[in-house]
Structures are given as C-alpha cells and as structure tokens.
C-alpha cells in the first residue's frame, strides 16, 4: 500500500500533442520531486522507496491550476508550475501543468482527490 504519491495536474483547455503533453508531465514530475527532495527529504525518501507513485489528472484551465497550487502550498506540499519554452506548439511562457508532491497521500488527496483522471 502506498502512503505517498505525486499528482500531476494538466490543463484540459490546452490542445497539446501526445508527445508535448508527455514531456510537460515529465517536467512537472521531475521538478516537483527535486523540490521535495530539498524541502521535504523524509517525504521524498519514503515516496522514492515505495515506487514513486504518480497520478495524472485534469483541471479545466489556468485559474484552476493556480487555485490548486495555493491550496497545496497552504498544506505544506511541494509544488511545481511548469511553463513551456514555446519552441513548438504553444506560446512561450504558457503554463501547462502543476505537479503536487510527493507527499502523504491523504494530504495530497485533500487538494486533488476531486479531480478526474486523464
């Protein structure tokens, strides 16, 4: 049973290719994990040794990402908001995903438990 997880929240309103989408999710997962390793080393270590559970869900738009980020940070969860470089499909600086955690599953679920899987 997993006790820790990371959730990556993608914007539903962006029309990204599968490849672009996968890269943005990966950027979020790695960036938030590195942040957690520095800020919450005990959470990172437990998550890493449990198998690094990750879940990808969807949010309606940018405003919802900002709201989720604020909620997560209020609970002390590490977050990473990913902005695209804009070299291929979307304008530079477009926020694509929000990664939350890794953190205790019950805390992460307070922020993301209502979101639908992608």
Swiss-Prot record:
The keyword Cytoplasm applies. It is an enzyme of class 3 (hydrolase). One of its GO terms (cellular component) is cytosol. One of its GO terms (molecular function) is peptidyl-tRNA hydrolase activity. It catalyses: an N-acyl-L-alpha-aminoacyl-tRNA + H2O = an N-acyl-L-amino acid + a tRNA + H(+). Keywords: Cytoplasm, Hydrolase. GO terms for biological process: translation. It is found in: Cytoplasm. It comes from the Archaea. CDD domains: PTH2. InterPro entries: Pep_tRNA_hydro_II_dom_sf, Pept_tRNA_hydro_arch, PTH2. Transmembrane segments: none annotated. Its EC number is 3.1.1.29. The natural substrate for this enzyme may be peptidyl-tRNAs which drop off the ribosome during protein synthesis. Belongs to the PTH2 family. NCBIfam families: arch_pth2, PRK04322.1. This is Peptidyl-tRNA hydrolase. The gene is pth.
